[in-house]
Amino acid sequence: MSKALDIARDLLACPSVTPADAGALGVLEKLLKDAGFETYRLTFSEPGADDTDNLYARIGAGHPHITFAGHTDVVPPGDNAAWSHDAFAATVDGGVLYGRGAVDMKGAIACAAAAVLDYLEANGGKPKGSISFLITGDEEGPAVNGTVKLLDWAAKRGEKFDHCLLGEPSNVNALGDCIKAGRRGSLSGTLIVEGKQGHAAYPDRAHNPLPEIASLVAALDADPLDQGSDHFPPSNLEFLSIDTGNPAWNVIPAQARARFNIRHNDCRTQDALRALIEARVEKLTGNRITARIEWEPSNADAFLTQPGAFTDLVIDAIEEVTGRKPKLDTGGGTSDARFITHYCPVLEFGLVGQTMHQIDERTPVADLDALTQIYRGVLTRYFK
């Protein structure tokens, strides 16, 4: 078996369903410590959230400094009986590795570790600069005791990163087809319309907020937020639920609430986006409807890593191994790259994401070997 496959199987065998670590960080820490890395295990806390383990490891000194980022926590496997192979048995069948986290994203962490170990072995055990690993156990959960705090801890001790590769499953159909060079932001809120509770048989004595919130939802949904930008598609507002909390069949509710989420580009800041939505609601309601918006806290603004030498270097390494020139993309959901971008340019490139979070999550072993070669090619080019 290849080194990447060995490491991946060891990681997949740890049932690290967020926020549990189940030994996953220990597998990686021992591997890196044995290779000469300085390692730091950190547990972060936050009221109302589970304490979560994290790992920072570094070898070398000075610059350039490349960090490989990722997460060892995984989503629950669902019905284990529905899997072709046990979700945490790390089974290889027909040249394919099965297991929760195979593509999201223990497989990519294994490839990065294998590539780094091979590079160090070929270069006297030290890079011409620094290599580090920034690995959290809190990405699939609330993401409050993970990368965001690990980065803050690293910055306070003087760590400075020049570039980051985050091993999220960026590819859509085949290894090498896509690099995530940015992400849309995410902003959520609740539209609230006030009415007057009353008996359903006497609507003249009540004020039903449901027709009013329905008209507001339809109007807000129909009005585009923007036309997109050079690197992002148009922002989209999606309503997720309309609720009154009313279990009765004969009571007109006093209030209606509609939850929504906005996936937005870089045309506006989140403050400007909030102001835009509130202005539209005010214009639609006038003096006829009593409505307001309650906004959820957000730490997920849109960002873009501008094309440059690092992007070109990664593209070259991918093209050399796969024969494909990857597209630079900003679609999909949020990731921990939204935190990393405040410290250094970050690109996301990992395995193919078609089976992430699904029953029978899996990756071809050939993709593990190819991704290892790509990361190895990045290191060779980076430390020329």
Curated annotation (Swiss-Prot):
The active site is at 73, 139 (proton acceptor). Keywords: Amino-acid biosynthesis, Cobalt, Diaminopimelate biosynthesis, Hydrolase, Lysine biosynthesis, Metal-binding, Zinc. The keyword Amino-acid biosynthesis applies. Pathway: Amino-acid biosynthesis; L-lysine biosynthesis via DAP pathway; LL-2,6-diaminopimelate from (S)-tetrahydrodipicolinate (succinylase route): step 3/3. Binds 2 Zn(2+) or Co(2+) ions per subunit. Catalyzes the hydrolysis of N-succinyl-L,L-diaminopimelic acid (SDAP), forming succinate and LL-2,6-diaminopimelate (DAP), an intermediate involved in the bacterial biosynthesis of lysine and meso-diaminopimelic acid, an essential component of bacterial cell walls. NCBIfam families: dapE_proteo, PRK13009.1. This is Succinyl-diaminopimelate desuccinylase. It comes from Afipia carboxidovorans (strain ATCC 49405 / DSM 1227 / KCTC 32145 / OM5). The lineage of its organism: Bacteria, Pseudomonadati, Pseudomonadota, Alphaproteobacteria, Hyphomicrobiales. The gene is dapE.
